[in-house]
């Protein structure tokens, strides 16, 4: 049996036997003066063994001058290829760790000169070796390692094999990866390094985050955030307009008066008289001056004057996230407005203006920032049941049967409309269309563009609420006859009736078109079906057809032939409240009741909704916040000593009015 070949040392020569090693040890003890000679001899041998290896694999640095012309095959050898971790043209090539290399250098310098030279030769061999040779060297070294050494290798390698992929990849791919992270993970990623922070805080990532969460519920995490404060958007718009009007094309500032803010600009009378509004008051002029003072502080020749100041999307998300968290946990401040002498029946707020109507026949305008009453509008002879205002006008409806148009900034009554034979309970205007609901069981449509009016008949009891959708030219109405109707303004007919409530329906609110309802969340209630105005066929059949009994079945539109030619469809979802103590979510195209909200102990008088939540107020003096997708009651507020009769909803606050003569505003702004 042949003996095994001797093990080859890492320096290229055969390893010495055990006897030879012992003999050398004895000789070294007897002849210590020969150690320097042995070291010098070993260094020469090592140099002769290492130099050819280095010259072969690193010819540019170690090959002699006379051997420059090497064979092309040797240059393109598979063993001389770089691995992907050591490609000089790759960004993922790992850089030296400065603290580790400093420690390594200090430990190396603590060794004798001969040991330093031997270790350096080993490093040189490994550094010059191609990928295949490196693997062989590593396998041989690890085969001789004991467990403590293998444990050291395992611990060290765990950190070395990590690659900074964010820094290595192109920014576009890094942004794509970061867009999959949630808010918490993004904030942690920004703490890794400066490079990670620059990418994790970039507007590309946070704009995507805002798109997923603001004004809608994220499908992945279920988190939704309110819109940006409209007041900030308007102030930014006004500043841009003022800056544009005070500079000409040559960059010089003319002696011109800045443009008035949007809420102080003169407008035409909504009644169609064509008269201009009066000149702005001292208060309105002061608003303009405040906007101009901020511009006057900047030098006229500075570039900053022309630059639009953008707010980083991360700050936008941060601001909205705080508001959304306050909504979730019910953290809010409350301001109470007192001044009416009878129950508050209607209200609306916008920016810092709050308008309230009461059974004391007055309308009060409040400053929400200070809580002070600005002015009182008087003119109605009976209780005020409904109102709505915009930047230029306020329209109110009263139990005296009249509709009045006011200049709420001055308190002047511009015009009065009478057309109902009973009190006006509800109204809503959009653009040039005004719809009013009355105790005379009708809905009246007022068109201020062509000065025309029409009556929509079909309800058999008081009509409590109306909503106009200008885009689809339709109107929703809710009545004490326990139904909700959808009307076509072009044909002046009812195209769908929603049945399901067993109490008088008090409110109907179309949800924004951005609202999305998952199909798996649907609670189909087959006993709540819609019909059409004919009512000549069974409810189940009419709900299946989705059309009038004498109409031709339309395959393209569930709302009838008039919606087949590309006409905008009505809002897809509506919510209603009734005195049966329930709130219902409906799909308008099919008439199905998708969800019923239970929780109030008595009839629900007030209702407001957006894409994130539903707010309701009831006879039980409670206000409830609902998730429209799950039907869960997220929060209940108390405080009123009388039934809650009206609600106004904003992105970061809501207001409630009650028969206790008080108005409460809940602000979730951080």
From Swiss-Prot:
CDD domains: F-box_SpPof1-like, WD40. It holds the Pfam family F-box-like. Residues 27-38 have a biased composition (Polar residues). Pathway: Protein modification; protein ubiquitination. Keywords: Repeat, Transcription, Transcription regulation, Ubl conjugation pathway, WD repeat. GO terms for biological process: protein ubiquitination. WD repeats lie at residues 339-376, 379-418, 420-456, 458-499, 553-596, 599-636, 639-670. Residues 1-38, 249-287 are annotated as: Disordered. It comes from the Eukaryota. Transmembrane segments: none annotated. InterPro entries: F-box-like_dom_sf, F-box_dom, G-protein_beta_WD-40_rep, SCF_subunit_WD-repeat, WD40/YVTN_repeat-like_dom_sf, WD40_repeat_CS, WD40_repeat_dom_sf, WD40_rpt. Signal peptide: none annotated. The keyword Transcription regulation applies. Residues 163-209 form the F-box domain. Component of the SCF(sconB) E3 ubiquitin ligase complex. Belongs to the WD repeat MET30/SCONB/SCON-2 family. Component of the SCF(sconB) E3 ubiquitin ligase complex involved in the regulation of sulfur metabolite repression, probably by mediating the inactivation or degradation of the metR transcription factor. This is Probable E3 ubiquitin ligase complex SCF subunit sconB. It comes from Aspergillus niger (strain ATCC MYA-4892 / CBS 513.88 / FGSC A1513). The lineage of its organism: Eukaryota, Fungi, Dikarya, Ascomycota, Pezizomycotina.
């Amino acid at each position: 049996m042949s003996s095994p070949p001797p093990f080859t040392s890492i320096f290229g020569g055969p390893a010495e036997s055990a006897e030879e090693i012992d003999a050398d040890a004895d000789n070294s003890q007897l002849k210590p003066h020969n150690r320097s000679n042995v070291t010098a001899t070993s260094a020469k041998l090592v140099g002769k063994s290492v130099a050819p290896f280095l010259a072969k694999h690193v010819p540019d640095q170690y090959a002699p001058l006379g051997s420059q012309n090497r064979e092309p095959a040797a240059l393109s050898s598979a063993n001389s290829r770089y691995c992907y971790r050591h490609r000089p043209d790759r960004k993922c090539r790992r850089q030296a760790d400065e603290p580790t290399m400093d420690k390594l250098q200090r430990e190396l310098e603590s060794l004798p000169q001969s040991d330093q030279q031997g270790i350096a030769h080993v490093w040189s061999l490994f550094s010059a070796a191609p990928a295949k040779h490196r693997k062989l060297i590593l396998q041989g070294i690890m085969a001789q390692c004991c467990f403590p050494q293998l444990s050291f290798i395992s611990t060290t390698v765990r950190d070395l094999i990590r690659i900074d992929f964010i820094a290595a990849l192109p920014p576009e791919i890094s942004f794509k990866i970061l867009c999959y992270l949630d808010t918490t993970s993004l904030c942690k990623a920004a703490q890794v390094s400066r490079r990670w922070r620059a990418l994790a805080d970039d507007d590309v990532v946070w704009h995507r985050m805002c798109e997923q969460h603001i004004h809608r519920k994220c499908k992945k995490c279920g988190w939704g955030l309110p819109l940006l404060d409209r007041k900030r958007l308007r102030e930014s718009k006004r500043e841009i307009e003022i800056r544009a009007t005070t500079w000409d094309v040559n960059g010089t500032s003319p002696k011109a008066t800045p443009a008035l803010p949007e809420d102080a600009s003169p407008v035409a009378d909504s009644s169609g008289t064509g008269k201009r509004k009066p000149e702005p008051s001292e208060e309105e002029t002061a608003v303009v001056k405040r906007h101009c003072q901020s511009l006057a502080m900047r030098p006229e020749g500075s570039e900053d004057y022309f630059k639009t100041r953008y707010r980083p999307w991360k700050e936008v998300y941060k601001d909205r996230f705080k508001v959304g968290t306050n909504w979730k946990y019910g953290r809010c401040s409350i301001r109470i407005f007192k001044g009416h002498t009878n129950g508050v029946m209607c209200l609306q707020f916008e920016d810092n203006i709050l308008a309230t109507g009461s059974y004391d026949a007055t309308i009060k305008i409040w400053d929400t920032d200070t809580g002070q009453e600005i002015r009182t509008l008087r003119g109605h002879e009976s209780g005020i049941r409904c109102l709505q205002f915009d930047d230029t006008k306020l329209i109110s409806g009263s139990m005296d049967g009249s509709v009045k148009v006011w200049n709420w900034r001055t308190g002047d009554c511009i015009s009065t409309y009478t057309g109902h034979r009973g009190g006006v309970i509800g109204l809503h205007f959009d653009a040039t269309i005004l719809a009013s609901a009355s105790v005379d069981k009708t809905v009246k449509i007022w068109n201020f563009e062509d000065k025309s009016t029409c009556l929509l008949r079909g309800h058999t009891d008081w009509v409590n609420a109306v909503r106009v959708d200008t885009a689809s030219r339709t109107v929703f109405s809710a009545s004490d006859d326990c139904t909700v109707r959808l009307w076509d303004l072009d044909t002046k007919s009812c195209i769908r009736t929603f049945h399901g409530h067993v109490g008088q329906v008090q409110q109907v609110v179309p949800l924004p078109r951005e609202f999305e309802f998952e199909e798996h969340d649907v609670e189909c209630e087959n006993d709540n079906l819609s019909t059409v105005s004919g009512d000549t066929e069974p409810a189940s059949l009419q709900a299946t057809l989705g059309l009038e009994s004498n109409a031709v079945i339309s395959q393209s539109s569930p709302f009838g032939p008039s919606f087949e030619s590309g006409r905008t469809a009505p809002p897809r979802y509506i919510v209603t409240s009734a005195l049966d103590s329930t709130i219902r979510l409906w799909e308008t195209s099919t008439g199905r009741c998708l969800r019923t909200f239970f929780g109030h102990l008595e009839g629900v008088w007030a209702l407001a909704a957006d894409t994130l939540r539903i707010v309701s107020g009831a006879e039980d003096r409670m206000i409830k916040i609902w998730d429209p997708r799950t039907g869960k009651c997220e929060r209940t507020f108390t405080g009123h000593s009388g039934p809650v009769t009206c609600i106004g909803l904003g992105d970061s606050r809501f207001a409630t009015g009650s028969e206790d003569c008080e108005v409460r505003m809940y602000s979730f702004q951080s």
